[in-house]
Amino acid sequence: MKAFFEKLLGFGPDRAIKQIEPIVRRINSLEPSVEALSNAELRAKTDEFKQRLADGETLDDLLPEAFAVVREAARRTIGQRHYDVQLIGGIVLHQGKIAEMKTGEGKTLVATLPLYLNALTGRGCHLVTVNDYLAKVGAGWMGPIYHLLGLSVATISHEYSAIYDPDYVDPKANPDDRRLVHWRPCSRREAYLADITYGTNNEFGFDYLRDNMAWDLAQLVQRELHYAIVDEVDNILIDEARTPLIISGPAQESGDEYRRFATLVRHLKPSPYTPDQIKKQMIEDPEGDFVIEPRSKSIQLTDQGVAKIERLLKIPEGESLYDPKYYRLTHYLDNALRAEFIYQRDRDYIVEHGEVIIVDEFTGRKMPGRRWSDGLHQAVEAKEGVKPRQENVTLATITFQNYFRMYQKLAGMTGTAYTEREEFAKIYNLEVVVIPTHRPMIRKDYDDQIYRSEKAKFEAVIREIEEMHAIGRPVLVGTTSVETSERLSEMLKRRGIKHEVLNAKYHEREARIVAQAGRKGAVTIATNMAGRGTDILLGGNPDGLIEEILAQRGIKIEQATPEQIRAAQEEARRITEAEGKEVRELGGLHIIGTERHESRRIDNQLRGRAGRQGDPGSSRFYLSLEDDLLRRFGPMDRVKGLMERLGVDDSLPIEAGLINRTIESAQTRVEGYNFDIRKHTVEFDDVMNKQRTVIYADRRRILEGENMRERVLDMIADEVHALVERYLPETKGRADDFEEWDIEGLVRAVRTIDPLLDETKLSPEQLEHLSRQEIEDAIMQAIEDDYQEREKAIGEENMRLVERRMMLSAIDRQWIDYLTGMEDLRQEIGLQAVAQRDPLIEYQRNAYAMFEELKANIQRDIVYQIIPVSFQYEQHLRQVEAEQQRRLLAAQQAGAADGNAKGARTVRHSVRLPGRNEPCPCGSGKKFKVCHWGREEELIALLQQRQTDQHAAVAADTPAQPAPQATATRPPTSQVPRGRAAPPPANPQPRSGKSPAQAPRGKGASARKK
């Protein structure tokens, strides 16, 4: 109905195309004049366009000429001319919209148009892909176009960065693949300074986080986030929207508990009921030890299960698993249950070389470097008998949703976006425009066939493969898991059918296998959408046959002469053209889906592998009542009852439009459910995103060398004002109530800020006859004098360096603690719904309070350390920078995380190091974090010397024990502290019993300015 009214009123998808058509006609009219230009004149057009921009013209003014120039450059360099529909796609991308272009319509070529146009501003453009291979190949393929027009293009990956240089030949690259040979290695910064940069979503996001952990401007690599085109935009902005990018460092956590609970949960049995059934049937005491909620992938223990766990853990009678003393155990129990009963090997992950590797549920690809968060990955490792790695603490994090929304202009392209247009509009403010195909689509999409059992379904799939293979039609079989692909592979082997398997275990051969999936008689089994981004050409890809043809002739490709390679290329073209003609006559590529995905879009992507550029093709999905989607979300009972009433045999399918509509209805419900979750994620993450923006902007100002002297003195003035209010209280309107004053306590507290304030500069006797304001002014004047004295002693330039380093160090330290607190808050906030409160509003309120405390803690860190640190500034700066280098090392090793990313190993010392809030073992009486924190090597040397002296004194010969790890216990989330204050060293307390650092914030800065 909505589509009908859109069409009637002229607001449908065709409207945008009609508005663009006059621009396309203008571009076409310029083609003859542009064709007449020489290469030098074509290149000079770039300088002309830049000058016209400087003179006041807009990119829209330049668009027709710029697109005509790019089209001609493409024809001259790579032999491809943009079709009119590709020009339409380019215009849509320039407008900051999403272009839905079907498979094979040339998205890589389309992107050159808006990238060139927007790069004319000199502010940089990014092309975002889903993997390093596509980024490098796409940029290398289009590189000659940009080079002819005088623009630079670079590519980045986790391992390298390189810039396109036609005069450079990479000795390690395949010499026959021109897309890969001209990549000259360069620095990361140089790659971002290129006019156009290709890379993956992970690398762009991680570079942003690394830049915001840098301690020197020279470490920054990215420029402003100006314009980006996201390839496979639905995969990155929807499928991976809930996957945060996390840079983490190691926490100190033992794996023993994970192994213990992995064994314990195997004694538990699942309930036969779902939560919905328990609710509908009002079952008070369900069978089994736990109930699985499939939608949220969570598990809830029954009363019987709780009792069994308490027996297994030997919890004394009268005590409960949920008592505070046992609370930390629920963390391990929950993860062990999910690992054992929800996460399945060869579906959600694989075990390879003693490592648990996550499998992408949408693409079926392995994701090395990614780790589930909050202990889940360690629980899966324990389940599989793999040594659990240390848990990590978050150093920096951002979601793809918030990263890509920072670009001033964002566009995207994919073959399947229209079904998700509402989400793109509401979350990213992106409109989806469906681009017409160059040739009409003639693929046949048959109705689904549904069977009672999974066994009958797979037998039917094999029969269909056999029929297609017998006549020579290529077949691509899409599966949803590694397990299914290997099951089908075994069945085909037993029938003697030659085939290729493409799944998470073999993705290294992905592009090559997919490229040949269109050859006559080819059978390819692909996990979900593996190979996305690689075209399937009917008859096969000739480039992929060259090595095979040479091998048949007894020639290794690296030893072949140019003449032999050319002969092999001709032979490959002849073979693929002949096979392509035969395959078209047979009906083209046939797609078989073995299970419906939760999202219609993923199913459409699989179908879209056939029927490219007007080629023939067909598709059909085979389902069973035992499939996950139907069991979890579909009306399985109704369909099963219908089959029983009709007396349908297990081996006979139901094939009807009604079934298709029923399944699509289930998919629509799931899509809506997942959309709500992602929208919910954005609403919560937006809270932290605003705070992250404030912190990162503050950090950047410090990094760029802004003079922080006045700001530091204002912070000190605030703290002094707060101390004056604490120690010299006003009483019922009387400003100077000397009986309640503790001037000695005030002086002691102030000396923790400025150790130079001895009796000659500031004493209780000097202050006891002054008013409160006069005392505050006298203290600040004395501190400012000492501050100036320190500047003269070490030099103003060095003092500015100390200020910047101290402020960056304080921000980073407190930000890490804050992120941990926010994670805990996010986990516990759902309980607010039980109290009839809106969790989002409560989250916003708590987050605001935590952020205010974060800022106060940062200020305290700086105030109580800046003057003392200036005495050993060189040594302290070395130690602080060494700590930052450790964090940056973790950042360089970071990969995308479904939760926590890999981090560096924790360094174990031969002496025990205290927690940050524990007394420093050096004997100073100060807390560790304001004494030897950041100077661990010095402390270790001191303690080791003491151990040696003690051993010598008692003639003992016992070796030093390894340092115990930081405690693994976690208090209940309601008790987790929100950030960590940085109080001054321990001193005699004021009458209230509170330390000076706990004094409330005051108005000292404003008073000082007066």
From Swiss-Prot:
May bind 1 zinc ion per subunit. SMART domains: SecA_DEAD, SecA_PP_bind. It is found in: Cell membrane; Cytoplasm. Its main location: membrane. GO terms for molecular function: ATP binding; metal ion binding; protein-exporting ATPase activity. GO terms for cellular component: cell envelope Sec protein transport complex; cytosol; plasma membrane. Zn(2+) binds at C920, C922, C931, H932. Its EC number is 7.4.2.8. Its cofactor is Zn(2+). Signal peptide: none annotated. ATP binds at Q86, G104, E105, G106, K107, T108, D535. PROSITE patterns: SECA (PS01312), SECA_MOTOR_DEAD (PS51196). Residues 893-904, 950-981 have a biased composition (Low complexity). Residues 893-916, 950-1010 are annotated as: Disordered. GO terms for biological process: intracellular protein transmembrane transport; protein import; protein targeting; protein transport by the Sec complex. Keywords: ATP-binding, Cell membrane, Cytoplasm, Membrane, Metal-binding, Nucleotide-binding, Protein transport, Translocase, Translocation, Transport, Zinc. It is a peripheral membrane protein. It catalyses: ATP + H2O + cellular proteinSide 1 = ADP + phosphate + cellular proteinSide 2. Part of the Sec protein translocase complex. Interacts with the SecYEG preprotein conducting channel. Has a central role in coupling the hydrolysis of ATP to the transfer of proteins into and across the cell membrane, serving as an ATP-driven molecular motor driving the stepwise translocation of polypeptide chains across the membrane. Monomer and homodimer. Part of the essential Sec protein translocation apparatus which comprises SecA, SecYEG and auxiliary proteins SecDF. Other proteins may also be involved. HAMAP family: SecA. Belongs to the SecA family. This is Protein translocase subunit SecA.
